[in-house]
Amino acid sequence: MSTTDTIVAQATPPGRGGVGILRVSGRAASEVAHAVLGKLPKPRYADYLPFKDVDGSTLDQGIALYFPGPNSFTGEDVLELQGHGGPVILDLLLKRILALPGLRIARPGEFSERAFLNDKLDLAQAEAIADLIDASSEQAARSAVNSLQGAFSARIHQLVEALTHLRIYVEAAIDFPDEEIDFLSDGKIEGQLNGVMADLEQVRTEARQGSLLREGMKVVIAGRPNAGKSSLLNALAGREAAIVTDIAGTTRDVLREHIHIDGMPLHIIDTAGLREANDEVERIGIERAWNEIEQADRVLFMVDGTTTDATEPAAIWPEFMARLPATLPITVVRNKADITGETLGLTKVNGHSLIRLSARTGEGIDLLRDHLKQSMGFTSNTEGGFLARRRHLQALETAARHLVQGHEQLVSAYAGELLAEELRLAQQSLSEITGEFSSDDLLGRIFSSFCIGK
């Protein structure tokens, strides 16, 4: 679809509201203003005007704002009409504008896409707009604003610039091998490369924090029936999210709760008790439980402390441990400490975390919250931090891998050509984050996830 068309969309959420905004972007924005307003508003000044239909009747009245390109959000001529937020009024106004020649409805994210294509935003900043809208906590919102203002992009540009300087030295060493100073063997390039690798690792650490803030952690509570899984879900959620009874198999389906621990989003999933199913409904619930377990970031293995003294997971339930993915982190939760009299606390058992608590009374729940936060490496002090997506983490990981391979080529064989290629590939991976090197397919996937009017 053409990016030279003039586009229009509602920039406020659908439904009733105090204010409804229509946004127009493109070369025909001034023609829309003349047709609907009767004049072109003074640039960047709010003008209170009637919004006219084709026959001259007034559809609504409100604020009109005109931003000539390139000094606008999209870099094109932009007109905003801010009227009353009734859906009927907005639909009538939208139909009025679409009746004009050369106008069409914007695709999801097309305003932000045009801002990116016109160099008003880089790709990381454009993504931050969607992240700010979707932020589920104050900390996530603040980090999204930092990304929108260029905090993440600035770190990436610093790394790219450092790699550019490093490539200059390497290319010089390759092109002028007979010079008195051999840059490849005198340690200068290795020292600079080590510095870039250290800086990249710091950015990766901050990006992992940003990814946790954005996407959160998926924790699945699993175990036998009546181990206290639903009670634990309620204790973590701080409300009666799940029905709790003494009847084994009360939970038949997956229950989900979304909470925050010091700003970190946590997706808690309560599952059906794992056992040989008594009927088809329970069998489906248990199958769904295993599907959730296999996709978890961490499993809370819930154990009824009144039924066993074992603390080693394989000794508690060998069949359960045998089916778990080998790389999946687990925390053994020995429940019902209020009955067994066990000392509350967190310990390590053969490399596994074990916590003793009472889901019914809430004793030990704060210890579990701290453990979940620490197990993901999350720190609540992220002043100046930024949000990151999975694709950002993948690009950073790829760049780090190329730098490690380049370092190996340098120290083992002084292979300048191979080092130069690894540096180029690392730089290319970093540039994918800001969109300086991105395929059209990637851009399409990113912007299609945005709101219509963004």
Curated annotation (Swiss-Prot):
One of its GO terms (molecular function) is GTP binding. The keyword Nucleotide-binding applies. Its main location: cytoplasm. It is found in: Cytoplasm. Keywords: Cytoplasm, GTP-binding, Hydrolase, Magnesium, Metal-binding, Nucleotide-binding, Potassium, tRNA processing. Binds 1 potassium ion per subunit. Disulfide bonds: none annotated. SUPFAM superfamilies: P-loop containing nucleoside triphosphate hydrolases, TrmE connector domain. It comes from the Bacteria. NCBIfam families: mnmE_trmE_thdF (TIGR00450), PRK05291.1-3 (NF003661), small_GTP (TIGR00231). Homodimer. Heterotetramer of two MnmE and two MnmG subunits. PANTHER family: TRNA MODIFICATION GTPASE GTPBP3, TRNA MODIFICATION GTPASE GTPBP3, MITOCHONDRIAL. Belongs to the TRAFAC class TrmE-Era-EngA-EngB-Septin-like GTPase superfamily. TrmE GTPase family. Exhibits a very high intrinsic GTPase hydrolysis rate. Involved in the addition of a carboxymethylaminomethyl (cmnm) group at the wobble position (U34) of certain tRNAs, forming tRNA-cmnm(5)s(2)U34. This is tRNA modification GTPase MnmE. It comes from Yersinia pseudotuberculosis serotype IB (strain PB1/+).
